[in-house]
């Protein structure tokens, strides 16, 4: 047999091609019937795992509600709402990006501050701290000194703070998930004071202290702090919230003892009930105190709002946002 050089070269080229195809896993050589060699490469790519982005946004909204009392004194309630929003997004690094649903949560902290007054010398400040459970028993210690005028002077004092005529009242009540502190300052010698600790949506606690000075203008008077308990259940058609309220009355009596002080403890448990309801279809809720001349009007504009006292509105806001990465 006679073989020329080109035939031997083609046979050797075919053998080397098969060896190269077996040794290289990624490159596969194919030979077709027309003698043309085709080759292709197989490429694989591993996608990176998903990356989670968490972003927290905090901002504060202040709302002021004007309130008109019976003596034509306009008082304002400042509601400070701190909303913390957590934005979570899931990102997958690939040819197309996929973002997951954004989750948002809101925490509301309400600190109302109410001030009203006329031109007399009596003033008082109360601090209320709210913690867990709706049924809690706490005591409130109150001390007062008369001043040399027709009324008496009550000054708030807290721990490590001293004052000439101390009157301190600290109430610890229960709430469900929200902490509220209220500070009240009034300058009327006979107006009732409302102390309020609010809860999230189902219960709240209110304390009303009525200061009723005697008509004696002598500098000698003795304050007797009489404690009574009552409960007010709010039966509102929109919220169904419950208000527990404790009423205490300070009644000064004539005495020649200028150094005497009265101290008592006020249990937070209640015995009697009273109903307050929404009286008109436009969402107006009238809340009355024991004194019929002292009242205010609260407008309920949202089903999530509830009335804790005459000057406090508690609402829960949820904010939803969508972020595209």
From Swiss-Prot:
Subcellular localization(s) per the UniProt record: Secreted, Cell wall; Membrane
UniProt feature, compositional bias: Low complexity: 218-241, 270-279
Induction pattern: Expressed periodically during cell division. Requires ACE2, CBK1, MOB2 and SWI5. Expression is also increased under microgravity conditions.
UniProt keywords, alphabetically: Cell wall, Cell wall biogenesis/degradation, Glycoprotein, GPI-anchor, Lipoprotein, Membrane, Secreted, Signal
Lipidation (GPI-anchor amidated aspartate): 308
GO-annotated cellular components: cellular bud scar; extracellular region; fungal-type cell wall; fungal-type vacuole; side of membrane
Proregion positions: 309-325
GO BP annotations listed: cell wall organization; pseudohyphal growth; septum digestion after cytokinesis
Signal peptide: 1-21
Protein's membrane topology: Lipid-anchor; GPI-anchor
Region Disordered: start-end pairs: 109-148, 167-200, 215-279
Biased composition (Polar residues): 242-269
GO molecular function: glucosidase activity
InterPro entries per the UniProt record, alphabetical: DSE2 (IPR026225)
Location, primary (coarse class): secreted
Function: Involved in pseudohyphal growth, cell wall metabolism and required for the separation of the mother and daughter cells.
Misc remark: Present with 907 molecules/cell in log phase SD medium.
Family to which the UniProt record says this protein belongs: Belongs to the DSE2 family.
Protein name per Swiss-Prot or TrEMBL: Protein DSE2
Organism: Saccharomyces cerevisiae (strain ATCC 204508 / S288c)
């Amino acid at each position: 047999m006679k073989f020329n050089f080109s035939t031997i070269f083609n046979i050797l080229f075919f053998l080397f091609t098969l060896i190269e195809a077996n040794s290289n896993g990624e490159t596969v050589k194919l030979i077709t019937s027309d003698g043309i060699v085709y080759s292709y490469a197989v490429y694989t790519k591993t996608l990176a795992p998903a990356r989670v982005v968490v972003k927290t946004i905090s901002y504060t909204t202040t709302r002021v509600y004007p309130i008109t009392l019976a003596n034509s004194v306009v008082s304002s309630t400042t509601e400070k709402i701190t909303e913390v929003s957590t934005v979570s997004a899931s990102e997958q690094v690939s040819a197309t990006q996929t973002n997951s649903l954004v989750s948002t949560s809101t925490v509301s902290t309400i600190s109302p501050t109410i001030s009203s007054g006329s031109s007399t010398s009596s003033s008082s400040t109360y601090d209320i701290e709210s913690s867990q459970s709706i049924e809690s028993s706490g005591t409130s210690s109150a001390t007062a000194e008369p001043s040399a005028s027709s009324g008496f002077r009550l000054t708030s004092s807290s721990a490590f703070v001293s004052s000439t005529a101390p009157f301190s009242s600290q109430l610890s009540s229960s709430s469900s998930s929200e902490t509220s502190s209220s500070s009240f300052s009034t300058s009327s010698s006979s107006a009732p004071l409302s102390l309020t600790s609010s809860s999230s949506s189902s219960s709240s606690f209110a304390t009303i202290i009525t200061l009723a000075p005697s008509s004696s203008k002598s500098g000698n008077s003795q304050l007797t702090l009489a404690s009574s308990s009552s409960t007010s259940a709010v039966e509102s058609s929109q919220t169904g919230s419950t208000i527990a309220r404790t009423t205490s009355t300070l009644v000064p009596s004539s005495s020649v003892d200028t150094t005497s002080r009265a101290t008592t403890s006020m249990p937070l448990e209640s015995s009697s009930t009273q109903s307050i309801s929404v009286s008109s279809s436009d969402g107006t809720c009238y809340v009355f105190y024991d004194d019929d001349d002292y009242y205010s009007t609260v407008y309920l504009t949202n089903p999530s709002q509830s009335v804790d006292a005459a000057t406090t509105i508690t609402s829960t806001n949820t904010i939803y946002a969508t972020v595209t990465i």
